[in-house]
Every structure is written in structure tokens, then in C-alpha cells.
């Protein structure tokens, strides 16, 4: 009998600040495009990473959430908590938004997928309870 495919998710919170600013634009254009978000401001972010796969009949799990928790702690919390995100090396030169953060975190966690036991299928970055970006990988938008 084929095992059911399930999705498991770990959620992590961190506090970070950023400024939405495109260095290729004038100060006036940045203010016009980004408004108040052109100034340094902060969010209590929530990041969710989801893995999907068949249920392992031996363990009763898709993957061990402890592994996902560890990778997320190392790639999200330890890298971003209480930081100005624009100064994080792997975000330099990027207009830091929930969208660009979701793609960057996808790349970092996907690179460690062999440690997770199941494929990464979604990253969600929430700036608030009412605003988030979700990324499902480069093939999802094709």
C-alpha cells in the first residue's frame, strides 16, 4: 500500500529591522515607491518552512522535525534575530522585503535539504498576522 504524502511545517519567530531602499533609485523615487518603509523600521517576523513526503511506516513521520528546527535555528534565528537585515551579508544589495527574504531563506534551507529527510516545499515569511510572502521554489511559478 502506498503511504500518504503529508506536509509538515516548523514556525520560528525573530525580530529584525530593515529599510526598503533601492540604491539604483533617487532618494525621492525611493520615498515615492516605499513610503514610510523607506525608513528603518522593524517587524516581529514569523518564518515557516514546510517539508513534504510520504509517511514513513517505521517512524510515523515524514521527517524528523528536530532536524528542521535545527536548520531553521541556524539559518534563520542565528543569522537574522535582532539584526538590521540590510547589513546581513547574504542580503546585501537586495531590497529587503518579505518576498526577497522568502527567496533567500528558501535558497539557504534548500541547500541543506539533505539534512532534513524530506524535500522543502514552501517558505512563508510573515511581517505581521495580516501580511506575508510565500515561496514554493523556482519551478512553482513556471
Give the ranges of each region predicted by the language model:
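Charge-rich, low-complexity N-terminal segments
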Residues: 1-142
Amino acid at each position: 500500500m502506498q503511504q500518504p504524502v503529508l506536509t509538515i511545517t516548523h514556525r520560528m519567530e525573530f525580530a529584525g529591522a530593515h529599510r526598503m531602499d533601492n540604491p539604483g533609485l533617487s532618494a525621492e523615487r525611493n520615498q515615492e515607491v516605499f513610503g514610510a518603509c523607506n525608513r528603518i523600521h522593524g517587524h516581529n517576523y514569523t518564518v515557516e518552512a514546510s517539508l513534504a513526503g510520504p509517511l514513513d511506516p517505521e517512524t510515523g513521520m515524514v521527517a524528523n522535525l528536530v532536524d528542521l528546527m535545527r536548520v531553521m535555528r541556524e539559518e534563520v534565528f542565528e543569522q537574522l534575530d535582532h539584526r538590521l537585515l540590510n547589513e546581513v551579508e547574504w542580503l546585501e544589495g537586495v531590497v529587503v522585503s518579505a518576498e526577497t527574504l522568502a527567496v533567500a531563506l528558501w535558497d539557504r534551507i534548500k541547500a541543506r535539504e539533505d539534512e532534513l529527510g524530506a524535500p522543502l516545499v514552501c517558505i512563508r515569511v510573515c511581517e505581521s498576522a495580516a501580511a506575508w510572502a510565500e515561496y514554493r521554489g523556482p519551478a512553482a511559478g513556471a
